[in-house]
Amino acid sequence: MVDRLANSEANTRRISIVENCFGAAGQPLTIPGRVLIGEGVLTKLCRKKPKARQFFLFNDILVYGNIVIQKKKYNKQHIIPLENVTIDSIQDEGDLRNGWLIKTPTKSFAVYAATATEKSEWMNHINKCVSDLLSKSGKTPSNEHAAVWVPDSEATVCMRCQKAKFTPVNRRHHCRKCGFVVCGPCSEKRFLLPSQSSKPVRICDSCYDLLSTGEMTACQSTRSDSYSQSPKSSLNDASDDDDDEDSSD
């Protein structure tokens, strides 16, 4: 089915429309063999709060961006190679329902669909695309992924020392290894995580100690799936993705 659509006029036209919606700031998406499988609006759990994002699933990449004008204009394009993607379902809790984790070596995050059916369709299609890619390349699924960041709203005090209260002056930081929200004194060290950056990145003292002694898997297990067990914030929308990163770090 996918191979048959690859060179069809309809597929080429659909991809061209997506390119036009992102404009000159977006990357070209039309390449031989690429097929647009589906698209839709998902709620992405960003650092500050959940936000609506437009997602496009291709047979080899997942693309998403900010919605400026629905079906007409998007910005801040992100492209994720599906070959490195793994996904895990998230239990429903509060206003956040029908969600799953999208995990990659460079970045991991949670998204939520409007209905359980939509969630199932997205997950099935993503898994099928990943499986087909790995089958063709002969590669094995990636077992390394970046931590999912705990949203700011879920931590009023540092998740490491459990003492420092966050204020406009004592601001929040995120450990790039475990994803915890931590204070400045608990995250003064940096460590090179090649899958995330070519430069050393901010990590918490706990992860630094484990990484320095070579216990990287132990460090990851401290994060575990605590994200899916922590309380969730209410749904909101915003116009940009600036708060996905610690801009000052």
Curated annotation (Swiss-Prot):
According to the UniProt entry, its GO molecular function terms are: phosphatidylinositol binding; zinc ion binding
Q: Where is the composition biased (Acidic residues)?
A: 238-249
Record bears the keyword Membrane: yes
| Boundaries of every PH domain copy | 35-131
Q: What cellular component GO annotations does this protein have? A: early endosome; early endosome membrane; endoplasmic reticulum
> What subcellular compartments does it reside in?
Early endosome membrane; Endoplasmic reticulum
Task: Give the residues the record marks as binding Zn(2+) 1.
Answer: C158, C161, C183, C186
Q: Which PANTHER family match?
A: PLECKSTRIN HOMOLOGY DOMAIN-CONTAINING FAMILY F MEMBER 2, PLECKSTRIN HOMOLOGY DOMAIN-CONTAINING FAMILY F MEMBER 2-RELATED
Q: Where is the composition biased (Polar residues)?
A: 219-232
> What does the domain comment read?
The FYVE domain is important for binding to the endosomal membrane.
Q: What does the UniProt record say this protein does?
A: May play a role in early endosome fusion upstream of RAB5, hence regulating receptor trafficking and fluid-phase transport. Enhances cellular sensitivity to TNF-induced apoptosis.
GO:BP terms for this protein? Answer: endosome organization; endosome to lysosome transport; protein transport
Q: Which gene encodes it?
A: PLEKHF2
Q: Where are the zinc fingers (FYVE-type)?
A: 152-212
Which keywords label this protein? Endoplasmic reticulum, Endosome, Membrane, Metal-binding, Protein transport, Transport, Zinc, Zinc-finger
SUPFAM superfamilies assigned to the protein according to its UniProt record, in alphabetical order: FYVE/PHD zinc finger, PH domain-like
Q: How does this protein lie in the membrane?
A: Peripheral membrane protein
Q: Which residues participate in Zn(2+) 2 binding?
A: C175, C178, C204, C207
State the protein's name. Answer: Pleckstrin homology domain-containing family F member 2
Q: Which InterPro entries match?
A: PH-like_dom_sf (IPR011993), PH_domain (IPR001849), PH_domain-containing_F (IPR051765), PH_Phafin (IPR037871), PLEKHF2_FYVE (IPR047966), Znf_FYVE (IPR000306), Znf_FYVE-rel (IPR017455), Znf_FYVE_PHD (IPR011011)
Which organism's genome codes for this protein? Gallus gallus (Chicken)
